[in-house]
Amino acid sequence: LGAEVISVEDGQKTLKDAVNECMRDWVTNMSDTHYILGTACGPHPFPEMVSWFQSIIGIEARKQLLELTGKLPDRVYACVGGGSNAMGIFQGFMEDPSVELIGCEAGGKGVGSYMHSARLAYDDAKVGVAQGYKTYFLQNDDGNMSETHSVAAGLDYIGINPIFSYLWEQGKVRFEAATDEEVKEALKLVMRTEGLIPALETTHGFVTACLLYTSDAAD
C-alpha cells in the first residue's frame, strides 16, 4: 500500500519499545504525522475508541451463543495484552451479572520470577503514568518500566487498558495468568483434541479455562 514499515531494534523489541519509538517520531514530526494506536491503551481517546470498535466481537458472540444454546455462558475468557481483544468480547456481556468475565494474562516464567507480563493477576504492578496514560504498569521501585516476558509476543507488554484497571478495581473483571509451560502443553492438547492450531495468545485463555474447570469439578 506504499507505507514505510520501520522495525524497532531498541530494548527488548517488544510492543513497549515500538510504542516508545512511535511516540518519539510523532512528537518530533507533528506537522506531517498522525499517531494511531491499534490496542486499547495510550492517551484518550484511544482506549475508549478502540474498545468501541472492538465491541462488535462481544455483540456477535452474545447473539450467536443465544441462538445456539438459548442461554448465556457462565464465564467468558479472553487473553489480555494491551486489552483490545478482551475488551471486545467482554463488552457483549458487561450488563449480564450472571456472566463472569475472566482475563488471562501472560504468566511467563511464573509468579515471583519477574519474567512475565501479568499486571493484575500477580502483585508486581503498580499504578503509574507512561506512554500517555495512567494504569497499572510493571515497574521497579524508582518508577522505571520493567522488562517483560512471554512466549506470546502479543501479550508481552508492560501496561494494561486503563478501562480494565477500573473494572478490576470495581470487581467487574477477574484476572488469572498462564505460564509459558502451561501454554505449550495446552497448545498441544487443543491441537490433538480439537484439530485447531490456536495462537499462543489465545491459548492463555484455554489454560485458564481448563484450570478453573478442573478446580470447579474437584469441588
PLM regions and their residue ranges:
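A glycine-rich helix N-cap at a beta->alpha junction
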Residues: 1-12
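A short, small-residue-rich loop immediately preceding and capping a beta-strand
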Residues: 72-85, 101-104, 215
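C-terminal structured "cap/appendage" subdomains that terminate the fold
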Residues: 191-212
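Conserved small/polar residues in nucleotide/adenosyl-binding loops
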Residues: 213-219
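Active-site/ligand-binding loops adjacent to catalytic centers
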Residues: 19-49, 69, 98, 103-196
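A glycine-rich, Thr/Ser-enriched phosphate-binding loop motif common to dinucleotide/cofactor-binding enzymes
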Residues: 46-60, 199-204
